[in-house]
Amino acid sequence: MAPKKSVSKAGKELEVKKKGGKKEPVVAVEPPLAKEMKEFYHIQIRDLEDRLARYQRKWDELAVQEKMFRQEFEQLANNKKEIVAFLKRTLNQQVDEITDLNEQLQNLQLAKEMEKDAFEAQLAQVRHEFQETKDQLTTENIILGGKLAALEEFRLQKEEVTDKFTLLEEQVRKQENEFRDYAYNLEKKSVLDKDRLRKEIIQRVNLVANEFHKVTTNRMWETTKRAIKENNGITLQMARVSQQGMKLLQENEQLKGRQNNLCKQLELLENTQKVMARHKRGHQKIILMLTKKCQEQQQDTKEAEELRLLLSQLEQRSLQLQVDNQALKSQRDQLSLQLEQQQVDLQRLQQELANEQKVRASLEAALVQATSFLQNILQMHRDEEDSDVDVTFQPWHKEMLQQLLVMLSSTVATRPQKAACPHQESQSHGPPKESRPSIQLPRTGSLLPQLSDITPYQPGDLGLVPRQVHIPPNPQDLRLLSYITRVGTFRAHSSPEMRAPGSLKRLEKFSLPEVPLRPK
């Protein structure tokens, strides 16, 4: 670009010289200083063209970034709308849940009160019935205790009578056995005695007969006398035996009468035993009835205990429902506090959005003014390509570019401060992460660091490498330049500030307008 413009300028100068040569054939000899200035201006023009192309690229990048920022901002607005709608929907759901829980709690309280009244009435009725049954059973127990005592006495008497009866039976059996043995022995003895007496009589008779036969001849009288005596003795013995038999018969009759008496007593005892067995059956039935009533009473007591346990469980359930009610109330209060906090955050976000919109509008205005300013500079540069180049234009041009960069850098410098203030406020006044929902904001400040990285122009800085520290000029590079260029670069490195000459007052129409850096 620069060589073509220089060639066109040289052609125009030659045409002008030719036209002037027709009038005055004067040969203009260019001094060496003008050549050096021309080279210097050519170098400056190349630098400015490169810088202009670089600024054009940066402007395109900024336009693309501004478009991306606008898309991110629209996405942020949509996300914010969705978040607000979601929060409202969740809030409505929580409010509905709270109302449902309140209704359920009221219904449970009413049901609990009704159940409590019903159970209290049932418990009072059960207590009354239990007291009545208790009194009735105590009286029945007293009566049955008396009956049991009588039955116990009767049982003892019965045992005594049965023992006596068994003893009497044993005695009767023993006496019968003894009587039978005695009668058998007597009969046996009588039979044996009869046999023995008969044998003895026969033997005696035989002996007597023998002796009689013997003594008949000798002692007839003595033998007869002796036989009479023996006969008398035998008759006496026979009388004694008959008397003993009579006594035995009398004793036998007495034993038979005693046996009859014992049989009668046995029949009486059997009758009394049957009567006692009947009474025993009746008492057993009464005891069974009493045991059944006692079991029923125990079952009633168990039911009363179960009712007491059920009542205690209902009381515990009512206490648990009260605790749940308190927890639901506290949860409702927390949700209301979270809702208020979210409303405050929503207002703050809306305010930040308004501030961002204002700052964005100010940035757009600054960019529009900067683009118009650059277009004016380019237009002025194109207009002056056809005319004579003023020596004082180049420093003024540098000063205007530096003023443009200062304006852009000040705009970028004020923007991060405003972007950092709401972030600090949100960190200082924001609720904890647990109570506030996480809202992921888009990267709105992605454009700001890139704008803040743009350093203001300094003379001698081509902008290819960002310089953060002062780099002194290389003497070997300065040898290739002319004296004026070396002095200019040295002054640019020593003092970056430049003053516009007084002849530039005619270009005041290209001065930068005032740009509001902060939103009103």
Curated annotation (Swiss-Prot):
Entry coiled-coil feature ranges: 33-189, 236-372
Report residue spans for region: Disordered: 1-22, 416-453
Q: Name one GO cellular component term.
A: cytoplasm
| Organism listed in the record | Homo sapiens (Human)
Please give the subunit comment from the record.
Interacts with TUBB and TUBA4A. Interacts with CEP350.
Q: What is its main location?
A: cytoplasm
Where is this protein found? Cytoplasm, Cytoskeleton, Cilium basal body
Basic and acidic residues bias spans: 10-22
Q: What is this protein called?
A: Cilia- and flagella-associated protein 157
Q: Which PANTHER family match?
A: CILIA- AND FLAGELLA-ASSOCIATED PROTEIN 157
Protein keywords: Cell projection, Cilium, Coiled coil, Cytoplasm, Cytoskeleton, Differentiation, Spermatogenesis
Keyword Cytoplasm attached = yes
Q: Which domain of life is it from?
A: Eukaryota
The family line of this record is:
Belongs to the CFAP157 family.
This chain's function reads: Specifically required during spermatogenesis for flagellum morphogenesis and sperm motility. May be required to suppress the formation of supernumerary axonemes and ensure a correct ultrastructure.
Report the record's Gene Ontology biological process terms.
sperm axoneme assembly
Q: Where is the composition biased (Polar residues)?
A: 437-453
An example Gene Ontology molecular-function term: microtubule binding
